[in-house]
Amino acid sequence: MSAPVIAIDAMGGDFGPHCIVPASLSCLAENPSLHLVLVGQSSLLEQLVAKHPGVDRARLKIVDAPEMVTMDERPAQALRGKPRSSMRVALEQVRDGGAQACVSAGNTGALMALARQVLKTLPGIDRPAMVTALPTRGAPCLLLDLGANVDCPAEQLYQFAVMGAVAAESLGRQQPRVALLNVGTEEIKGNQQVKLAAALLQQAAGLNYRGFIEGDGLYRGEADVVVCDGFVGNILLKSSEGLAGMLVAKVEALFRRSIAARIVGAVALPLLRRLRAELNPAQYNGASFLGLQGIVVKSHGSAGADGFKAAIRRAAQDVEHDLPAQLRDRLGQFFRVDGSSGGTDDVTARDGWPSN
């Protein structure tokens, strides 16, 4: 496999280039085969890179983009008012062959709209979905959508399930178990969209559909792919991250309560460090946009250096597996592909996506 080349929107996120550039350079140093394209205000990026004299400049390129998309900007403004934004230029690097993937911590709605306009969707796909892996009692579970589509008809949930199954297969899962997130496992439970999606999935030959799953079943590892709309998925993801942080803090506080507790804590320190590492949301940062004719990974806007590095690693993994090609090869098995891009509708029609 050729060395992965990843375009970085260096101006996005809550912390901007002062976090993203050092994180990117650290990732570059840790991965000898990796090549990065930093996109943003070139004079500032050069200054930040100069603070790291050991950087292998043969594997680093800086592309100027004088404009930036703010975290509270509406997608329509990003699409029509900023033709030289770092987000757009990074996506254009993928479209034009200068990079194989794009990573951004910027505004989610703007990234979705720009990605659909610049890269287009795969034939048969109406809208891309954001997917990430969540830890369970067993192997990690893929959850989608995570906020790119807050309202989803049944057909879109069906498409998400297909894309999630293909993504799970690319990670080595055989016949991945697919489930719809619902308020109960009984067939009578759920809203109309979920019930209609279930009917579609039950008829899908070649898809290992297991029915409805509740939130606790996800963490028990009862499915390899869990599908929901972006409204539910975004709340579930961020609630899970908050819960993980609280649990780690509670455990650490317990071992500081007394001298005896501190002694026990010192003995258990290796296990505590392992628990903290396994529950650390940063290592799961980076949601892939499935359904595009190119690879795009969204980092949390609030991610620190470790989280952003995880998003870069996710992009490199997607490049290795060539997810768009795998999806393109499999879509016709599950629904009619008519050759249209699936992305010709007005990408600014919905401005209500979450910003991070």
UniProtKB/Swiss-Prot annotation:
It holds the Pfam family FA_synthesis. It catalyses: a fatty acyl-[ACP] + phosphate = an acyl phosphate + holo-[ACP]. GO terms for biological process: fatty acid biosynthetic process; phospholipid biosynthetic process. Keywords: Cytoplasm, Lipid biosynthesis, Lipid metabolism, Phospholipid biosynthesis, Phospholipid metabolism, Transferase. SUPFAM superfamilies: Isocitrate/Isopropylmalate dehydrogenase-like (SSF53659). Its main location: cytoplasm. The keyword Transferase applies. Its EC number is 2.3.1.274. It is found in: Cytoplasm. One of its GO terms (cellular component) is cytoplasm. It comes from the Bacteria. Catalyzes the reversible formation of acyl-phosphate (acyl-PO(4)) from acyl-[acyl-carrier-protein] (acyl-ACP). This enzyme utilizes acyl-ACP as fatty acyl donor, but not acyl-CoA. Belongs to the PlsX family. PANTHER family: FATTY ACID/PHOSPHOLIPID SYNTHESIS PROTEIN PLSX (PTHR30100), PHOSPHATE ACYLTRANSFERASE (PTHR30100:SF1). Homodimer. Probably interacts with PlsY. This is Phosphate acyltransferase.
